[in-house]
Structures are given as structure tokens and as C-alpha cells.
From Swiss-Prot:
This is FMN-dependent NADH:quinone oxidoreductase 2. Its cofactor is FMN. PANTHER family: FMN-DEPENDENT NADH-AZOREDUCTASE 1, FMN-DEPENDENT NADH:QUINONE OXIDOREDUCTASE. Homodimer. It comes from Bradyrhizobium diazoefficiens (strain JCM 10833 / BCRC 13528 / IAM 13628 / NBRC 14792 / USDA 110).
Amino acid sequence: MKLLHIDSSVLGPHSVSRQVSAAIVDRLRQATPSLEVVYRDLTQTPLAHLSGSHLAAAQGAPAPAELGPDLAASAAVLNEFLAADVVVIGAPMYNFTIPSQLKAWIDRILVAGKTFQYGANGPQGLAGAKRVIVAISRGGYYGADMPTAAGEHLETYLRWVFGFIGITDPEFISADGIQVGPDHREKALAGALQAATSLQAA
């Protein structure tokens, strides 16, 4: 079994989402010692945002030589995702949504003919067999009963993205209110780490 581990926080060892995503991977490794893990840190090895020349090349136009490294990185990222049985993502909320580094990664895996296709009844996801677990951290509280709920574009966006490619039941472990104060951060992190250790292994 193969697991792809993605981190996107810019905070390094101070990141809550990184701590929780690591705990998720540790839990799955304990349950399946033979688990093969591929790790990609989107801040240490950032992907370029899509360009017009990249999109043109993807649609069959001649690719200039200088685009070669970008196309190679795109192919590597897509192949990592396609090969994975399980995908674990550390995703903090930045300005109400995902980090731009994670958006650049998503732009490389949402590829027509690979992870989705257009059919007579509209788009159809092709990646439904994968398990996706996301460790999210948010500075405030964005529950459905909160006045800030309309500003939540992290979990809602990721649910839509993964649903679009056929993964209709992504799992989320959340650490909320981490910027409200030290006590809130400690409690949120402890709860998320406990949820990670209690995660169903298969």
C-alpha cells in the first residue's frame, strides 16, 4: 500500500497542521508497517503556478525548452497522486482558504483524462478508490452555527475538489481556534492529535 503525505504550511516545526498530518501518518504506519510513504513538502519544494504556456502545452501545443522542468514537475506530482492508495494532507487556513502552495498542487492533479473526465452527463471523477485524510488548522471558529461560517473556504473547497475527482468522502481532522489564545491552541492541538491516534486504520 502506498501513502502520499503532503504538507503546505509555511510555519515549519511551529505548524499545527504539520504536527497533525505527521500523527496521522504515524498512526497508519503503525497499523500497516509495510506502508510505503512518499512525502512532498510544498513549501520546501514549491510548485510554480500554472502559466499560459503550460496550459497550451497540456493541450498539445509545442512546449518551449524552458518549460521542460515545469512539465516534469507536473508529471511527477500527478504520478505520485495516481500511485497513492491513501493521501494525507496538512492544510492550514490562510485568509479563509487553502495556502497558494496547495492550490498549485491541486492544479497539477486535476487533469482531464487522468483524475476526471467529461461524459454525456457532465464531469465524472476517476480517483474514487483513494482515501484522503486532511489535517486542517484554523485560527478562529467556523462552525455552521458561527457568524464566521460563510468565510470558511478551506474544508468546503477541499470537499468540493476531491468530490469532483470522485473522492466523495474525504476525512477531516480539525484544530480550530488556534489563534484565539494559547489555551485554545493547546486544547485544539491535543484534540486533533487524539483524533489522529484514534483514526480507523483501514
